[in-house]
């Protein structure tokens, strides 16, 4: 029992270590102060509020995760398709494994995103509207790198975090992780259309979030594209190399279940083969 708790503490420690970069960078909140050219039209767009706010995005992700994971693991444990040698309750152990893996991948994804944001400091499309430069101090004949912003310091700092999109990377990570979870867990014949339908809406939400970041003038299209790719990459690597979703036991993979349903038994094969 004590050994099991050591493993739990080790898992928690790993998640915390993976979270350190984005925690530290967020607390310091000092991105690279990149300058600009007066004639740069890519940062002259008007400021617009978020279509998908942080609260709305968190609500959708948390709801989808709780509903899919809790119901999926409950059904598999109840039907004895999923079991654990843990000292804890089978359902608790199953939920712990999925959520622990999910949180670890989320920490990695967010840390990678914030490293790029704070180290590169790319200006958002609405930077000049947020900055509100004091043009009397600006020499437009060259590269402007002096501090000339009259806008809110907090908003100006936020306007320096364009590359790459955190909404896109985190949204794609979470939704693709859940889509792969559904692929691994929802593997019965009656779910052949239900499974891709659920996966479509999960991934479509992540892509929609990315589109809104461009239309809201929060990110350049390349910021969103890189964010989506990074989120997808981290989700795939986490599911393939950290989780046990596609291991044969537990649970049985979809391929094994389907093959066992399609293939005739050994005795039936031999009987048919002996006929003249």
From Swiss-Prot:
The lineage of its organism: Eukaryota, Metazoa, Chordata, Craniata, Vertebrata. This is Phospholipid phosphatase 2. Residues 164-167 are annotated as: Phosphatase sequence motif II. Magnesium-independent phospholipid phosphatase that catalyzes the dephosphorylation of a variety of glycerolipid and sphingolipid phosphate esters including phosphatidate/PA, lysophosphatidate/LPA, sphingosine 1-phosphate/S1P and ceramide 1-phosphate/C1P. Has no apparent extracellular phosphatase activity and therefore most probably acts intracellularly. Also acts on N-oleoyl ethanolamine phosphate/N-(9Z-octadecenoyl)-ethanolamine phosphate, a potential physiological compound. Expressed in the brain. Belongs to the PA-phosphatase related phosphoesterase family. One of its GO terms (molecular function) is ceramide-1-phosphate phosphatase activity. Magnesium-independent phospholipid phosphatase. Insensitive to N-ethylmaleimide. The keyword Membrane applies. Residues 117-125 are annotated as: Phosphatase sequence motif I. The active site is at residues 167, 219. Keywords: Cell membrane, Endoplasmic reticulum, Endosome, Glycoprotein, Hydrolase, Lipid metabolism, Membrane, Transmembrane, Transmembrane helix.
């Amino acid at each position: 029992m004590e050994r099991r708790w050591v493993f739990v503490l080790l898992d928690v420690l790993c998640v915390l270590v993976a979270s350190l970069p984005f925690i530290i960078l967020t607390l310091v909140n000092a991105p690279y102060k990149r300058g600009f050219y007066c004639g740069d039209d890519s940062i002259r767009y008007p400021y617009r509020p978020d279509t998908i706010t942080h609260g709305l995005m968190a609500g959708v992700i948390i709801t989808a995760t709780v509903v899919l994971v809790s119901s999926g693991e409950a059904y598999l444990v109840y039907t004895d398709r999923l079991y654990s040698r843990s000292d804890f309750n089978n359902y608790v152990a199953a939920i712990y494994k999925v959520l622990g893996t999910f949180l670890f991948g989320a920490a990695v994804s967010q840390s990678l995103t914030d490293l790029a944001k704070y180290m590169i400091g790319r200006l958002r499309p609405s930077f000049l509207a947020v900055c509100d430069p004091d043009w009397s101090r600006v020499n437009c004949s060259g590269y402007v790198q002096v501090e000339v912003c009259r806008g809110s310091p907090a908003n100006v700092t936020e306007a320096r975090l364009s590359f790459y999109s955190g909404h896109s990377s985190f949204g794609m990570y979470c939704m693709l992780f859940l889509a792969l979870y559904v692929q691994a867990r929802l593997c019965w014949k009656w779910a052949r259309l239900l499974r891709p339908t659920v996966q479509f809406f999960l991934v479509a939400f992540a892509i929609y979030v990315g589109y809104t970041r461009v239309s809201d003038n929060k990110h350049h299209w390349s910021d969103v594209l890189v964010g989506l790719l990074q989120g997808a990459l981290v989700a795939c690597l986490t599911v393939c190399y950290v989780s046990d979703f596609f291991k044969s036991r537990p649970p049985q993979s979809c391929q094994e279940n389907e093959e066992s349903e399609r293939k005739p038994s050994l005795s039936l094969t031999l009987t048919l083969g002996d006929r003249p």
